[in-house]
């Protein structure tokens, strides 16, 4: 629970996460100008705190995580797309403090807890949200958020009662962040659209610079 509380507190300070997925060149160690690592370094320099690195069943994945950690020590790194016990094992090897899953899997969630890993489950339906709350999850990821709309969680609060804090993820851009936060979400996760071959989205850079502090 300490890791969960720490992540919730950190997201309260900066309610945004960037989700990245290294390609083969990144895994091979191509970390020069224009690389994913170079772009992450740029985001870290303007104050980004939270990055999820999409897990891959590749022995080079942990090495990439280590390089990001070394070059961008201010970033709080977690793993994205956790679906298997194999992925949990890699998470332990890398020593990452948290991971996100796109699905609600009670068996995987319990296994993560047994290994001291904070796994934030993905939820979509009212049933999944209620089950996650019953299992003691204080933080969940609504995925894909774009499919249900910004008011979805608010509409569930009356019939379901107290709910976990919610990260909105899936199909959202920088321009959506403020509306989803105002609707009561704890944070917003941004995916592939905020980093391309040209670098980080200038809108994201401005958002980070404006909210830094």
Region roles according to the model:
Residues 1-95, 114, 174-175, 194-213:
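Conserved N-terminal beta1-alpha1 strand-loop-helix module at the mouth
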Residues 20-24, 79-85, 101-104, 121-126, ...:
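Glycine-rich beta-to-alpha transition loops that act as phosphate-gripper elements at the mouths
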Residues 44-49, 71-74, 93-99, 113-120, ...:
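Glycine-enriched alpha-helix->loop->beta-strand junction motifs that scaffold or abut catalytic
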Residues 58-60, 86, 107-108, 127-129, ...:
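Short secondary-structure capping/turn micro-motifs that flank functional sites
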Residues 84-94, 127-135, 152, 172-188:
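Catalytic cores of alpha/beta
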Residues 102-108, 141-150, 183-204:
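Glycine-rich phosphate-binding active-site loops on the catalytic face of alpha/beta enzymes
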Residues 102-148:
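Histidine/lysine/aspartate-rich catalytic loop segments that bind and position anionic ligands
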Residues 131, 147, 151-159, 163-167:
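Shared catalytic-loop signature of beta/alpha-barrel
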């Amino acid at each position: 629970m300490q890791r969960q509380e720490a992540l919730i507190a950190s997201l309260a300070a900066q309610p945004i996460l960037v989700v990245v997925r290294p390609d083969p060149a990144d895994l091979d160690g191509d970390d020069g100008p224009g690389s994913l690592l170079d772009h992450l370094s740029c985001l870290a320099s303007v104050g980004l705190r939270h990055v999820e690195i999409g897990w891959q069943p590749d022995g080079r994945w942990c090495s990439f995580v280590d390089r990001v950690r070394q070059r961008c020590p201010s970033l709080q790194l977690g793993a994205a797309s956790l679906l298997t016990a194999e992925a949990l094992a890699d998470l332990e090897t890398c020593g990452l403090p948290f991971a996100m899953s796109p699905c609600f899997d009670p068996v995987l969630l319990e296994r993560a807890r047994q290994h001291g890993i904070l796994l934030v489950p993905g939820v979509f339906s009212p049933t999944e949200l209620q089950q996650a709350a019953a299992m003691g999850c204080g933080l969940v990821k609504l995925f894909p958020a774009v499919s249900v709309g910004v008011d979805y969680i608010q509409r569930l609060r009356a019939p379901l009662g107290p709910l976990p804090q919610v990260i909105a993820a899936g199909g959202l851009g920088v321009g959506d962040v403020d509306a989803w936060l105002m609707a009561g979400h704890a944070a917003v996760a941004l995916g592939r659209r905020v980093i391309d071959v040209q670098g980080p989205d200038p809108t994201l850079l401005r958002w980070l610079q404006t909210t830094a502090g």
